[in-house]
Structure formats: structure tokens, C-alpha cells
Amino acid sequence: MRQGKMYRVKNLAKNVRNDCMGVINHGPYQRAPHARLETLDSSWKAPVKDTLRDGDVVACVGVDKFVTDHYESQPFYKVLTLKGHVAYVSKGNRNKYFELVRD
């Protein structure tokens, strides 16, 4: 992901359970206090109200590095959703669930 570019969510419909994405502010793999954009099961009733589905667009607003449970800094891409939430996307989720809207 590059700063200032728009990205479309893709491939979520192929998942059996985790068929949407939402901003998560908690979790077991969190070493730094930052919100993450993670896949979610849409049937799970959670405090996450706004979810992203295939075709939704986010904007990349930067890249930061955070120490993960692997004890090394990993790049996390800071994105802005259409609802105004700012969250971080891991490199693995970036490759699997996002595509550049256009160059």
C-alpha cells in the first residue's frame, strides 16, 4: 500500500466464516495501542457496528512499524475507512484482501 492511494476490499466473500472486516480495538496479539482492521464473522454480534465488505474502499494514509509477538518490527498500513475510522492493516491482510482502485 502507498500513502494517498485508494484500495478496494476483495476476496471476503470467498471465506466461509469471516466474510466482513471491522475495526478492532482489543485482542491477544496487540502490543501497541492501535486499532486494527481484521476479518470478522458477520453473524457474530459484537460491538463492531461498521463493517466493510467486498467492494468497499479505504484510503492508505501512512505506514508505521510495530513490534509484534514475533519480537520484531512489522509494517502496518494505516487506513481511513469511509466512516472516518482510522485503523492498521497487517501485511498479510493487505496482500489477501485489498487491491489498488487505479493508478
Tell me the role of every PLM-derived stretch.
Residues 92-101:
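Structured surface patches comprising rigid loops and adjacent beta-strands/short helices at the edges
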Residues 14, 23, 39-42, 54, ...:
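Generic detector of low-complexity/intrinsically disordered segments
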Residues 10-12, 61, 80, 101:
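A structural detector for beta-sheet-dominated domains
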Residues 53-92:
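SH3/SH3-like beta-barrel superfamily modules
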Residues 27-29, 34-68:
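Conserved beta-strand/loop element in small beta-rich adapter and peptidoglycan-binding domains
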